[in-house]
């Protein structure tokens, strides 16, 4: 039986080019397609982020308010978009737009703005803004509070240009690997431990030096993974939320109760542990039989 089309699928460069320039009229069909994908039951405020990467592909992000959990654990539309870009090995973000209705395009919230600043050449990202009187393209830094902008100016330049880096490898290894599960090529295997370690090695944690990765398995044995992403101004998207984005964009949708197993990899002596947050989120949204195992790395 043919699989239904993936509603989160990116537009190819050809599709993006044929749809027209990155403007409100051409983005409206994408916004309308994505709005039902947002999970915003408590707030009743769905939001869509649309981004065009350096490859020419166009990606979607939506806000996800996780049922039964504090809004602090919600996935913002901009955070979703950044993970979607990273999962698809995009290197930069050329164009960006946020909308809750397809008619007006708004600036990103402070959390998303801070995270987006970590992307290579973020100052060159075209941010589409509309208001009742005019349309304009703005710089992301325009919406970054001055106190945070000064923080970015103090950060060594080599920290930047790495958030979207498919070649990043933090050089982590498991402290006590299971010899039964030793892999000839851990880069392509689907063991949860290997996938979680691989995710931790892609983690973007230049400030806390506390990388983490999560791998999740559903009832069908399919594996999804994600890694933590930091910004200089403190907001962090945890590895568990990033793995849920992988789950949503690769066939799982919002059926989080199909998730039955998970592994988290982090440093044993990490200054910032992601375990408590990951456990709280996954124990709430995954299947009641869900088990999360923790492996330490160095």
Curated annotation (Swiss-Prot):
Positions bound to Zn(2+): 76, 109, 112
Keyword Zinc attributed: yes
Keyword field contains Zinc: yes
PROSITE patterns attached to this UniProt entry: CYT_DCMP_DEAMINASES_2
Residue ranges of every copy of the CMP/dCMP-type deaminase domain listed in the record: 22-151, 187-298
A GO molecular-function annotation: zinc ion binding
Cofactor(s) in the UniProt record: Zn(2+)
Residues that coordinate or bind substrate: 63-65
Subunit structure, interactors included: Homodimer.
Family, per entry: Belongs to the cytidine and deoxycytidylate deaminase family.
NCBIfam families in UniProt: cyt_deam_dimer
Protein name: Probable inactive cytidine deaminase 9
Species of origin: Arabidopsis thaliana
Lineage: Eukaryota, Viridiplantae, Streptophyta, Embryophyta, Tracheophyta
Gene assigned in the entry: CDA9
């Amino acid at each position: 039986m043919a699989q239904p089309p993936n509603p989160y699928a990116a537009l190819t460069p050809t599709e993006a080019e044929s749809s027209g320039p990155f403007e409100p009229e051409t983005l409206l069909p994408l916004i309308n397609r994505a709005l039902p994908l947002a999970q915003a039951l408590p707030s009743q405020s769905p939001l869509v982020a649309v981004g065009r990467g350096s490859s020419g592909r166009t990606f979607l992000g939506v806000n996800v308010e996780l049922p039964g959990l504090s809004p602090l654990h919600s996935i913002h539309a901009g955070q979703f978009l950044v993970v979607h870009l990273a999962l698809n090995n995009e290197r930069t973000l050329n164009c960006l737009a946020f909308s809750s209705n397809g008619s007006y395009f708004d600036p990103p919230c402070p959390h998303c703005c801070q995270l987006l600043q970590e992307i290579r050449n973020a100052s060159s990202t075209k941010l589409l803004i509309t208001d009742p009187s005019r349309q304009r393209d703005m710089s992301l830094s325009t919406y970054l509070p001055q106190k945070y902008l000064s923080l970015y100016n103090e950060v060594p330049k080599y920290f930047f240009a790495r958030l979207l880096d498919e070649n990043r490898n933090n050089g982590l290894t498991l402290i006590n690997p299971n010899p039964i599960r030793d892999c000839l090529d851990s880069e392509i295997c689907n063991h949860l431990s290997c996938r979680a370690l691989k995710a931790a090695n892609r983690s973007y944690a230049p400030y806390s030096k506390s990388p983490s990765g999560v791998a999740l398995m559903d009832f069908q044995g399919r594996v999804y993974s994600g890694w933590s992403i930091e910004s200089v101004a403190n907001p962090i998207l945890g590895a568990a939320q990033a793995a849920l984005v992988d789950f949503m964009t690769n066939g799982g949708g919002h059926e989080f109760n199909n998730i039955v197993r998970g592994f988290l990899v982090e440093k044993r002596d990490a200054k910032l542990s992601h375990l408590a947050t990951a456990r709280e989120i996954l124990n709430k949204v995954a299947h009641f039989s869900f088990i999360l195992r923790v492996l330490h790395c160095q």
